[in-house]
């Protein structure tokens, strides 16, 4: 902890939140704001993962898809929120969830996503649409699909999550949820400054920043 002795506050993002050093930091008296990870005693800022998955799955459903696969990321508060939202939204839509279509993967692992996509494509009754944990994974899935001579979205539809610029520049443009990372960073920084300057009046809360659905062209409109 000596490395943080002279700092006024710490913004934590894109780390292994289970790391002992991170846990020790969280339990210290240093003002801390975490991004996309919720601790009981710390202020957290994240995108609205519940609404994001709800909007994404609802759009896919409205395009006529009923066999929807979801490759989700490693265990975390973000993943838990997304999975619960997936099940809840499916129930509200009256869409049956095939448990074989829900597969655990990892965030930002394109190669891993390729292998999991292959597993889904090899199923006797394969899904008509695959949702990936992020856009990088969607790109990996896209590679596997194209390597088999299949077309997106004519043969199979895909959707990502993040809204990174490259997925909006390729054809077909990837359907995804745009996360306003700049806004998330700004809100996190503002809250950290408040924690440092006004510790007695700063609330320990979970601040949520909404994202937006980018419809793209990677989800096919199914024929009735």
Language-model segments: residues:
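Central regulatory/effector-binding core of bacterial HTH transcription factors
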Residues: 1-18
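Bacterial carbohydrate/catabolite-sensing allosteric modules
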Residues: 9, 20, 24-224
């Amino acid at each position: 902890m000596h490395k943080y002795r002279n700092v006024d506050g710490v913004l934590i993002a894109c780390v292994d939140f289970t790391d002992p050093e991170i846990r020790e930091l969280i339990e210290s008296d240093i003002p801390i704001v975490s991004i996309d990870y919720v601790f009981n005693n710390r202020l957290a800022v994240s995108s609205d993962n519940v609404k994001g998955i709800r909007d994404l799955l609802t759009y896919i459903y409205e395009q006529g898809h009923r066999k929807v696969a979801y490759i989700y990321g490693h265990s975390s508060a973000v993943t838990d929120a997304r999975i619960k939202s997936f099940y809840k939204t499916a129930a509200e839509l009256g869409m049956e969830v095939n448990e074989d279509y829900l597969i655990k993967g990892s965030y930002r692992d394109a190669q891993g996503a390729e292998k999991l996509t292959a597993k889904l494509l090899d199923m006797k009754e394969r899904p008509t649409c695959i949702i990936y944990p992020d856009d990088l994974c969607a790109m990996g899935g896209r590679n596997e699909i194209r390597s088999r001579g299949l077309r997106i979205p004519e043969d199979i539809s895909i959707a990502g999550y993040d809204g990174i610029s490259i997925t909006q520049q390729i054809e077909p443009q990837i359907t995804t949820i745009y996360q306003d990372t700049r806004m998330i960073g700004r809100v996190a920084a503002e809250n950290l400054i408040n924690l440092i300057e006004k510790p007695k009046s700063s609330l320990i809360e979970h601040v949520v920043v909404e994202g937006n659905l980018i419809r793209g062209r990677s989800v096919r409109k199914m024929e009735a």
